[in-house]
Structures are given as structure tokens and as C-alpha cells.
């Protein structure tokens, strides 16, 4: 479909989701990033983008995706998605804080 010029947020979300299911977060992330570029209000795509980035070893980028998704979810009134992304974001924040050397925290 992409080769035929039929790009869209749903197609990119679906491709990203399938790559994630196959365990290939590195290939999933660009499709999910394109999904949110095509439809910035696509809450589910923000959530999956955060997951793909986290699984791909990009915690800072995952945190940014979750935060953007939380903003979208709040604006749209999607409380459940916002709560889920908030939980994932907090986990990443804790992991990042634990990885920081003590001298950086002062």
C-alpha cells in the first residue's frame, strides 16, 4: 500500500503494531512516528510509539512520546489512555533517575 502511494496514519499504526508484535521495535518506531506526524491526535499511536522507543532502548525519546500522548489524551478526554501512558512515563522516569550517577542528582 505504501508503494502504491496509499499512506495514512492507520496504515502506519498497523505496520508499527505488526513490527512490535514480531519483536522488531526498531522497525516499528519509524512507522509509528509517521502515524503521529500524519495524525497528531492519534492517542493509540502515541502510546505504541512510546512502547516501541522504550523497547528499542531509547528511554528519553519514549518519555517524550508518552508525554505528548498524555497531552493529546487529556485534550481529547481520553482518560484511560492518558492514565496508561502516565504509568509508563513514570516507570521510565524512575529508571532514568536510578541510572543517573549520584553526582548528577545534586
Predicted regions and their residues:
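Structural marker of alpha-solenoid helical repeat scaffolds
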Residues: 4, 38, 55, 72-76
Amino acid at each position: 500500500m505504501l508503494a502504491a502511494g496509499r499512506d495514512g496514519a492507520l496504515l502506519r499504526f498497523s505496520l508499527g503494531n505488526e513490527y512490535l508484535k514480531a519483536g522488531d521495535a526498531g522497525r516499528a518506531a519509524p512507522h509509528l512516528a509517521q502515524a503521529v506526524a500524519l495524525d497528531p491526535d492519534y492517542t493509540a499511536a502515541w502510546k505504541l510509539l512510546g512502547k516501541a522507543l522504550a523497547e528499542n532502548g531509547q528511554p528519553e525519546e519514549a518519555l517524550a512520546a508518552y508525554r505528548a500522548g498524555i497531552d493529546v489524551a487529556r485534550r481529547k478526554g481520553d482518560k484511560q489512555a492518558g492514565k496508561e501512558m502516565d504509568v509508563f512515563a513514570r516507570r521510565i522516569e524512575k529508571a532514568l533517575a536510578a541510572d543517573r550517577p549520584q553526582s548528577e542528582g545534586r
